[in-house]
Amino acid sequence: MLKTQLKRVALITSLLVSSSVMASTGAYNTDIPSSIITPDKVETSIGTLNFKDGVPSQQTMEMLYNNLDTMRATEVFMNAIPMASMEALRVGHEKMGLTNSNQVMLFDDLMDSNPLFLTGNTDTVYASAFLDLERDGPTVVEIPPGMGPTTVNDAFFRFVTDMGVVGPDKGQGGKYLILPPNYDGPVPEGYHVSQSTSYTNWFIARGFLKDGKTDAAVNSYHTGLKIYPLAKKGEQPKMEFISGSGKSFNTIHANDDHFYDEIKTVIDKEPIDFIDPEMRGLIAAIGIQKGKPFEPDARMQKILKDGAAIGNATARALMFNPRTENAYIWDDRNWKTAFIGKDYQWLIDEGKGGRNLDARTYFFYMATVNTPAMALKMIGKGSQYAIVDKTAEGKFFDGGKNYKLTIPANVPAKNFWSVVAYDTQTRSELQTSQPFPSKNDKRDKMVENPDGSVDLYFGPTAPKGKEANWIQTVPNKGWFSILRMYGPLEPWYDGSWKPSDITEVK
């Protein structure tokens, strides 16, 4: 009898405990961690999300898919800037009449502020051409002796090869052979050989001034630069040089939803493995796929406009206020480096930390040309860049105010140094009544201080007696500046030489 009663008590107790557990876990048989349960209402930055036992409501699902597509459109904008930028450059050349690799845009009178080029310089004699390896196959580039830093980049602005003083010819001139992607045909001897990952490739050469003039570099291009398909080695097409100096044309990618049309053109042109599956998938998620129509519906058109607007705004935030400490060259100055992390592939800790995507966006929203020679320490050979857009107090430059920059004596630059002013909107040379918004120690006769330093002045009007050292700015327009060091020497790298911050003069 007692035994039966004890069994009955145990059963009742078990049922009560089971009922208690069921109640506390929402009809589950076991205790469920709250961290894996989705509440029926969730407050987020995109609004209130409603669920029924974990299933999103129809309205919530629409909200989430709109947000997902906007995030992807934004990511595509930020990560595909190199691709869109190269396409805009190609189209800019095409509109200037350059459609074949033997046609070279030559800035025989330097690059002034008329064309829209991302932070182009006013200091070297540019020669620019596009290679089409799909049409022409392996292509030969012959460069003359004495060339400055010269580079070939692929259609994603990835490094293919250097030439000239920083290339394997070491400034002695030479013959280069650029092979198409996946090429497995014969490769003749006698060339510096590189294989590109894309059909479209940009050749950009820099010639140095001699006695402040372009003549020597221009003559060198005319007599020594040759670009032709290897298949036409015996009957090379005649070189054509088209002047870009003083011309008005655009080479900058769109900042609105036309951006996606630019990258669609590239995706259709290039081989499928031009970008990796993950990047292809991200781009395909917004409707862009090789060989297929890109026809976004009304909903997606609105999302693409929004994604481009957010991506563009974010790229500008990264450019003007990078949040990584190693963006700044010196602890006590507001000068930023061009290559955050000092790596032309933007790898963190030699790749252990992956790729710094923000640093890559920062660079390509502001600039073009990607080469180790601009990022690595190359004493007396490469080039280094310092960018500044605010005073020591952290105030962005105002084109209606006056500023001063001191360049200390004994500038550690073997070839030359220069300071160029740029437009914060276009990231191109600032357009003023001065055709060249810059000062260059080999071209301009500037007034030195008794200690050998040089004071440069920025403002809408020249300070009295300082006209030779003045760079004009525009009221109600922002600007920033880049200090270039060609052939940088050890004091640049060890920090024993550095420019002042730019200070307001009242």
How should each PLM-predicted stretch be described?
Residues M1-A23:
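Gram-negative bacterial Sec-dependent N-terminal signal peptides
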Residues A23-K506:
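A compositional/structural signature for long, glycine/proline-rich flexible linkers
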